[in-house]
Design a protein with these regions (language model features):
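Positively charged n-region of N-terminal signal peptides that target proteins for export
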Residues: 1-4
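Bacterial N-terminal signal peptides
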Residues: 7-16
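Mixed-charge, low-complexity intrinsically disordered regions
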Residues: 17-78, 83-155
């Protein structure tokens, strides 16, 4: 159950618009932008907790979200198989691009600590981090949103 949910979480997100066919998991609008900005800010303030967890893991499925820009479009991607060294995260792009063409699923990507827009990991069936998902819950059917809310370690 955790793996399919993780794939769903890793697929969800965001920003800007374009005319091409987009993956159905790409969320371009409909969420509260101020709530999303606050979620990203909270994630960045708490990223040292994630780095500590990554260096001494008590959970699994560690991931970091990175904004990637190409031709004026910005899309957020989850990186998996994360490492952190010299103030940089490195990982594998975990979802298909929908708006940018300078990256592909399975590609290695590196980003500075301050560039991360979110982070997450699982422990004992609970999800830590993934703050950027919370503003998206209002857009989901209530049953689906309730399932995700029950998985969050923090409200």
């Amino acid at each position: 159950m955790i793996r399919p949910l993780m794939a769903s979480w890793l697929s969800l997100f965001l920003l800007c618009g374009c005319g091409q066919s987009l993956p159905e998991t790409l969320v371009k609008s409909g969420y509260d932008e101020k709530e999303m900005e606050a979620a990203i800010s909270l994630s960045q303030r708490e990223i040292d907790l994630f780095i500590t967890e990554l260096s001494q893991p008590t959970g699994n499925n560690h991931a970091v979200k990175v904004p990637i820009t190409d031709a004026g479009e910005t899309e957020h991607f989850w990186l998996t198989d994360i490492t952190f060294q010299n103030n940089e995260f490195s990982g594998i792009i975990g979802n298909e691009p929908g708006m940018v063409s300078n990256v592909k699923i399975g590609q290695t990507w590196t980003l500075k600590k301050h560039e991360a827009s979110d982070w997450m990991f699982m422990r004992d069936g609970k999800m830590y981090g993934n703050y950027t998902m919370r503003p998206l819950l209002k857009m989901m059917p209530e049953e689906e949103a309730a399932m995700y809310r029950s998985m969050f370690a923090e409200p």
